[in-house]
């Protein structure tokens, strides 16, 4: 008898490994893919396949990122791992690979190191909502008490950065020993090998602790306006890609940005590829016909949104990465009062950089190419801004930096 085809539609979650250099992020990534390949029949990835990460471009910045995918019984995961520390910083700030949760890898032999803390801080600021900890290199720690001390230190560090350090799941193990066992015998199943079982228990915690993200279509409607034209006898059409949510004919929307106050209108028609629609959803490239709006009232850079869900702002705090010379960025430092363009969604808005702060909160006077810095920005026009929003910093049309908003000031 032919076997029935077994299909499953599992919820999808994006995660990544973060942590200090050489604490075992890539080894763990390889061990997870190999262990789950054994149980779900997918393809495992070797360390060297993940380590040779291809270059990608996001917001004008080149980043090396490795993407792997795997499945547990409950979910499908897309997992991002970066080879170098600078790639992590760039990846998290540009949002090139959005993370719904992260596995923080800490060597049990060393405990939290400077980059451990930097990655936790970045995760908090760029809005990675949940973290699960893997205490790696357990085989190198002879004393169980030492491992407990490291675990306490990791929990305290997480609490320092406003993660719930007492609740975060912590799993100890050895990614290397698990990977070596799986390389010798790729068919190891649960219960056959102590080290491989620790990888399974880590993924059980990830399954249980990191919530399934809200789907884009369930969020409130937002579309950045890319182009505007008028249709004689019918009115004004704004086109763009629906960033999130859904919109139906007859619904009220707000036009936000580049003016002090939002304007409300009614959607009288939706068009996609010359066909009319009743409803448009996240991901659609669509033309939205708006009642009672003149062509001069709306322009590229504004957004259409569900009323009351997003407001225009001029001032915000952001975490920013400034490109170095080799990456095509500036060759010279810049100072407070620097006025570049901030490219947000679909448009450039000039802004003035009011102040800079280092990670420890100390003020700095100048920023060098290649630095990561916190800054306060004052835009000359209000635009629709929200926490977690990404932007590029440009100067004469070329990208000199990338940032993420973590606080709105007015």
Curated annotation (Swiss-Prot):
This is Elongation factor Tu, chloroplastic. Residues 81-84 are annotated as: G3. The lineage of its organism: Eukaryota, Viridiplantae, Streptophyta, Chlorokybophyceae, Chlorokybales. Residues 19-26 are annotated as: G1. Belongs to the TRAFAC class translation factor GTPase superfamily. Classic translation factor GTPase family. EF-Tu/EF-1A subfamily. It catalyses: GTP + H2O = GDP + phosphate + H(+). It comes from the Eukaryota. Keywords: Chloroplast, Elongation factor, GTP-binding, Hydrolase, Magnesium, Metal-binding, Nucleotide-binding, Plastid, Protein biosynthesis. Residues 60-64 are annotated as: G2. Residues 174-176 are annotated as: G5. One of its GO terms (molecular function) is translation elongation factor activity. Residues 136-139 are annotated as: G4. CDD domains: EF_Tu, EFTU_II, EFTU_III. It is an enzyme of class 3 (hydrolase). It comes from Chlorokybus atmophyticus (Soil alga). InterPro entries: EF-Tu_GTP-bd (IPR041709), EF-Tu_GTPase (IPR050055), EFTu-like_2 (IPR004161), EFTU_2 (IPR033720), G_TR_CS (IPR031157), P-loop_NTPase (IPR027417), Small_GTP-bd (IPR005225), T_Tr_GTP-bd_dom (IPR000795). GTP hydrolase that promotes the GTP-dependent binding of aminoacyl-tRNA to the A-site of ribosomes during protein biosynthesis. The keyword NAD does not apply. Residues 10-214 form the tr-type G domain. Mg(2+) binds at residue 26. One of its GO terms (cellular component) is chloroplast. GO terms for biological process: mitochondrial translational elongation. PROSITE patterns: G_TR_1 (PS00301), G_TR_2 (PS51722).
């Amino acid at each position: 008898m032919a076997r029935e085809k077994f299909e499953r539609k599992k919820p999808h979650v994006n995660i990544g490994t973060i942590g200090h250099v050489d604490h075992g992020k890539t080894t763990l990534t390889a061990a997870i893919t190999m262990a789950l390949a054994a149980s779900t029949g997918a393809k495992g990835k070797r360390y060297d396949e993940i380590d040779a990460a291809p270059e990608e471009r996001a917001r004008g910045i080149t980043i090396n990122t490795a993407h792997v995918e795997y499945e547990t019984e409950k979910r499908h995961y897309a997992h991002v791992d970066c080879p170098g520390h600078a790639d992590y910083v760039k990846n998290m700030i540009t949002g090139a690979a959005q993370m719904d949760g992260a596995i923080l890898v800490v060597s049990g032999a060393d405990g939290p190191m400077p980059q451990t803390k930097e990655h936790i801080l970045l995760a908090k600021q760029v809005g990675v909502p949940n973290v699960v900890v893997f205490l790696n290199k357990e085989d190198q720690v002879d004393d169980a008490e030492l491992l407990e001390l490291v675990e306490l230190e990791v929990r305290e560090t997480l609490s320092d950065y406003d993660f719930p350090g007492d609740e975060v799941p912590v799993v100890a193990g050895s990614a290397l020993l698990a990977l070596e066992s799986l390389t010798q015998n790729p068919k190891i199943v649960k219960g056959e090998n102590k080290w491989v079982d620790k990888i399974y228990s880590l993924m059980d915690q990830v399954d249980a602790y990191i919530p399934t993200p809200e789907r884009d279509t369930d969020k409130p409607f937002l579309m950045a306006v890319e182009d505007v034209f008028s249709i004689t006898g019918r009115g004004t059409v704004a086109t763009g890609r629906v960033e999130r949510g859904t919109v139906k004919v007859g619904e009220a929307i707000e036009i936000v940005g580049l003016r002090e106050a939002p304007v409300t209108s009614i959607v009288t028609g939706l068009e996609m590829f010359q066909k009319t629609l009743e409803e448009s959803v996240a991901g659609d490239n669509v033309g939205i016909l708006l009642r009672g709006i003149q062509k001069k009232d709306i322009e590229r850079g504004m957004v259409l949104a569900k009323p009351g869900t997003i407001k225009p702002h001029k001032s915000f705090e952001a975490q920013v990465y400034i490109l170095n010379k080799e990456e095509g960025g500036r060759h010279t430092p810049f100072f407070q009062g620097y006025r570049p363009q901030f490219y947000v969604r679909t448009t450039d808005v000039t802004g003035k950089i009011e102040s800079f702060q280092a990670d420890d909160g100390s003020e700095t006077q100048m920023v060098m190419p290649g630095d990561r810095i916190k800054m306060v920005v004052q835009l000359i026009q209000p635009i629709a801004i929200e926490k977690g929003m990404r932007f590029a910093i440009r100067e004469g049309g070329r990208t000199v930096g990338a940032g993420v908003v973590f606080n709105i000031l007015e």
